[in-house]
Amino acid sequence: MQLFLLSNLYIIMQTTVSLGIDIGGTNIAFGIIDKSGNCLANGSLPTTAYNTPQDFVQDLYKTVKKELDNLDVQLVGIGVGAPNGNYFNGTIENAANLSWKGTIPMVELLTKQFGVPAFITNDAKAAAIGEMVYGGAKGMKDFVVITLGTGLGSGIVINGKLVYGHDGLAGEVGDRKSVV
């Protein structure tokens, strides 16, 4: 935290951070990240420990709040990568590798609990963004990232832009019907 004096008025400048969440079929990893991309704190929670996404969000909030208080930082946003994460709808849609069934309004749940904007995308698309900004695809305009974990997915980048498709599900390969 920085403290500035401006005509007998103190202004407190608190470091701002984002929360990154990777929801997987086995574990949910999270990290508190500063503006430079440094991970200030991280952890994981077992996905199967939560009967509902609401239970998960409440437990995540308690865990992250402690870290934010210890670091004396201000959370300004949340980014989520999840199987069948739909960027357009803010939902996780019928993910075969999660025990939570149906359409889950994850962005709504996180925004309500944390009080900051949240965004979601498919976990493989999030991996493609990570590779484009920090990893092996840095400087590349066209590439595909294929992920294999509890599920199978891909993130497609064409001309430096992530491809979402008309419904937000472009690149989903793990639980889609395929013609061979």
Residue ranges and their predicted role:
Residues Q2-L3:
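Cationic, low-complexity basic patches in intrinsically disordered or flexible, solvent-exposed regions
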Residues T15-V17, G31-I33, A41-S44, T48-P53, ...:
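Glycine/GP-enriched mid-protein hinge/lid loop-to-helix segment characteristic of carbohydrate kinases
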Residues T15-A82:
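Conserved phosphate-binding loops in N-terminal lobes of ATP-dependent enzymes
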Residues A49, P53-K65, Q74-I78, N84-D142:
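Glycine-rich phosphate-binding loop and adjoining helix at the ATP-binding site
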Residues P83-N86, G149-G151:
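Short glycine-rich anion-binding loops that position phosphate/pyrophosphate groups of nucleotides
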Residues N8-Y10:
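Intrinsic-disorder-associated, low-complexity terminal segments enriched in Asp/Asn/His/Tyr and depleted
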Residues N27-A29, A126-A128, G151-G153:
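Short glycine/serine/threonine-rich phosphate/pyrophosphate-binding segments
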